[in-house]
Amino acid sequence: MTIYNINLGIGWASSGVEYAQAYRAGVFRKLNLSSKFIFTDMILADNIQHLTANIGFDDNQVIWLYNHFTDIKIAPTSVTVDDVLAYFGGEESHREKNGKVLRVFFFDQDKFVTCYLVDENKDLVQHAEYVFKGNLIRKDYFSYTRYCSEYFAPKDNVAVLYQRTFYNEDGTPVYDILMNQGKEEVYHFKDKIFYGKQAFVRAFMKSLNLNKSDLVILDRETGIGQVVFEEAQTAHLAVVVHAEHYSENATNEDYILWNNYYDYQFTNADKVDFFIVSTDRQNEVLQEQFAKYTQHQPKIVTIPVGSIDSLTDSSQGRKPFSLITASRLAKEKHIDWLVKAVIEAHKELPELTFDIYGSGGEDSLLREIIANHQAEDYIQLKGHAELSQIYSQYEVYLTASTSEGFGLTLMEAIGSGLPLIGFDVPYGNQTFIEDGQNGYLIPSSSDHVEDQIKQAYAAKICQLYQENRLEAMRAYSYQIAEGFLTKEILEKWKKTVEEVLHD
C-alpha cells in the first residue's frame, strides 16, 4: 500500500499547498504509512532535493516526474567544479567569480563555462552553461551526477532551447524531450515515443501499477487532472481542497461558480472516493452546495493541515495588556488596520502594547503609521521569530485577514491560550474563534470602510479588557485547541486511510 500525493511545482517561497503536503508527509512517517509526493513541473533552476528538503520532505518520499524514468535518486548536490570541467575539454586560462557564479575561461579558444554554485562558499555546482563563439550551446544540471542537459541553437541572436536529455547514473541517455518554442512536444525513448505532456504523465501513472490497496491524493490538477482521474480509477482517489472553493459573488440560487482550480474535480466528483477540507465549516458549506447544485453527494472529510504537539502554558507569566499578531507583512493581511485600531484603543487603555511578527512589503508603511502617531513606545515590528514559545508571553491575538482558509498562526495562538479577535470570515476565523467565548468575530462587509473597521476592533479590544474575561476566554481557547493536537490529527488520518482502503 502506497499513498501517492500529486502536485505540480515547488520553490523556495512555497505556498500553503506545499506546507500542507510537508505536514502530511510528517504525519505519514509517524503512522509508518508508505507515501510518495510527486512533482510534475519541470524544475531545473534548483536541484529539487534542496527545495523539498528545505520544507521537510524526506528524500525517499519524493518522486520527480522527469527523473522517474531514470535510475537517478533524489539527493543533494555533490558535484564539484572539477567534476563539471571534466565534461569540457581544453586548457584553462583563468577564472572570474561573482557570488555564486563562477566563470572559467580557456586558452586560445573562444569558449567559457559558467558554473552556478549551490553556495558561494562551496565548490558545488547546481548547473553549468557552456558558451562557444558567443553562443550558448548547452546547459548541464547536477545532483550527485549529471541528470539533465539542455541543448540550444542560435536564432535571431537568441539561444533557442530545442532539446532536453535525461540520463541514468552511468551517464547513458534515457530519453530526449524535443522542444518547440519553449513547449515540450515529443518525449523520445529508445523503444517508445510520447506526444505531449499528458501522454507522458499517463505513462508515468501507468508505471506506478496502481491497485485497490493504493491511495492517490490530488493536491493540484492544472493540466494533468483528466489523466490522473482516469489512471487513478484502479486505486482510490482523494482530492484536497486547499482554498475557498467557489466565488460567492458569482453564485445565486440556481448556479454556482466553482473556483477554476477545483471545477474539474467537482464536476467529476462521482470518480472521487473522498474530498479533504481542513475545517468543519468548509465541509458543511461544500456538502450543502453539492446537494443543491449537483447530482453528486461525495464523501467529504475534515482533516486539518497542521497541528500542535501540546498545549503551551505561560511559564514566565504573560505581559499584562499585551497584543500580538504574526503573518507576512502583505497588503491582504491588513496589519495597518490593526495598528490604527490599537492606536485608537490605546487612548482608553494606555497600558496596551502591540507586537507584530513577520516581514514583507508593508514594513515601511507600518513604520510610517506608527511614527506618525508617535506610537513607537507601544507598537513594535519584531521581524521573524520562532513563535512556538512566544505566543504564551502575550494575552490577546489579533488578525485582520479577510480570507484565511485555515490559519496556522490562529491554531498556534489558541494552543497557547490566547483569545482572538478577527473578522467573521471563512474558514479559519470561524473555526478558531467562538464569538464571545474565546474572543470576538467582527462583522465583515465587502466595502471595507477603514474607519469603521478601526473603531470596531478598538471597541472589541477595550471590551475584552473592561469585562475582565481574559481567564475564561483563555480556558476556552485551550479547549478548542485540544481538537488540533497532533495525536488527534494522526488518528483522523489513520481512520480515513483505513476506511477507504477497506471499503
From Swiss-Prot:
Phenotype for residue 403 to A: Significant loss of N-acetylglucosaminyl transferase activity
Q: Where is this region: N-terminus R-fold-1?
A: 1-78
Gene Ontology cellular component list: cytoplasm; plasma membrane; protein N-acetylglucosaminyltransferase complex
Q: Name one GO biological process term.
A: protein O-linked glycosylation via serine
Instruction: Report which reactions are catalysed by this protein.
Output: L-seryl-[protein] + UDP-N-acetyl-alpha-D-glucosamine = 3-O-[N-acetyl-alpha-D-glucosaminyl]-L-seryl-[protein] + UDP + H(+)
Assigned keywords, A-Z? Cell membrane, Cytoplasm, Glycosyltransferase, Membrane, Nucleotide-binding, Transferase
Q: What is said about its interaction partners and assembly? A: Monomer. Interacts with stabilizing protein GtfB, probably as a heterotetramer with 2 subunits each of GtfA and GtfB, part of the accessory SecA2/SecY2 protein translocation apparatus.
What information about domains appears in the record's comments? Has 2 Rossmann-like domains, called R-fold-1 and R-fold-2. R-fold-1 is interrupted by an extended beta-sheet domain that loops out of the structure and is required for recognizing both PsrP substrate and coactivator GtfB. UDP and N-acetyl-D-glucosamine bind between the Rossmann-like folds.
Protein name, as recorded? UDP-N-acetylglucosamine--peptide N-acetylglucosaminyltransferase GtfA subunit
Q: Which organism is it from?
A: Streptococcus pneumoniae serotype 4 (strain ATCC BAA-334 / TIGR4)
Q: Which gene encodes it?
A: gtfA
